């Protein structure tokens, strides 16, 4: 069985989402992130690639850079650029690119499921990159960016996704960085939350 749980997401207010949104940290280098974040103090790059707040050439793995990530994460929350939800939810996230849309559930995953093979590895990753992101998670006590998993076709989950995606989303915008459409819904009804948890619990791996 796969163990998942809802969580209190920390996310931007609707009116700030386009300013906060960024591309994944691993699709661009420090200088590209520095350029995309130029003039935008609300860009998530200040958290996921905090070396941009230091002089060019600063070692991105220096302890002070990780400390800056934590400092910026706290600053974003203090200023209301990132706000934690009051209750635990699941979320639905859709990406639209080249005329095609893919939907996913945003959930809290159970790390031991990854370690014991319930969650299957789908790619070979570099150890240095893994260490970097683990340090980032530890210093922030938060996973700032999602990790994508796949799961088998499931009619119950499909129905829940269809139910929410037929409603007005919390966010719906085209990101300036990648030109992709990003749409986001909040799964906040107790029955739906319980159903999602139960369906994943039925999955052997």
What are these regions (language model features)?
Residues 1-204:
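A cross-family signal for N-terminal binding/gating loops and helix N-caps
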């Amino acid at each position: 069985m796969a163990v998942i749980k809802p969580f209190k997401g920390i996310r931007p207010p609707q009116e700030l989402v386009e300013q906060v949104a960024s591309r994944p940290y691993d699709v661009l280098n420090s200088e590209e992130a520095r350029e995309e974040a130029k003039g935008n103090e609300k860009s998530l790059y200040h958290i996921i690639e905090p070396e941009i707040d230091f002089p060019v050439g600063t070692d991105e793995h220096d302890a002070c850079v990780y400390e800056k990530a934590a400092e910026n994460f706290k600053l974003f929350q203090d200023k209301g650029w990132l706000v934690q939800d009051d209750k635990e939810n699941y979320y639905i996230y859709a990406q639209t690119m080249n005329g095609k849309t893919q939907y996913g559930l945003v959930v809290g995953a159970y790390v031991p499921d990854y370690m014991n093979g319930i969650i299957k590895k789908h790619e070979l990753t570099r150890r240095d990159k893994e260490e970097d992101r683990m340090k980032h998670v530890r210093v922030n006590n938060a996973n700032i960016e999602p990790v994508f998993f796949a799961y088998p076709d499931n009619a119950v989950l499909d129905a829940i996704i269809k139910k929410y995606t037929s409603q007005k989303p919390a966010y719906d915008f085209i990101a300036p960085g990648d030109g992709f459409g990003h749409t986001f819904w909040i799964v906040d009804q107790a029955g739906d939350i319980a159903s999602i948890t139960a369906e994943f619990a039925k999955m052997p791996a």
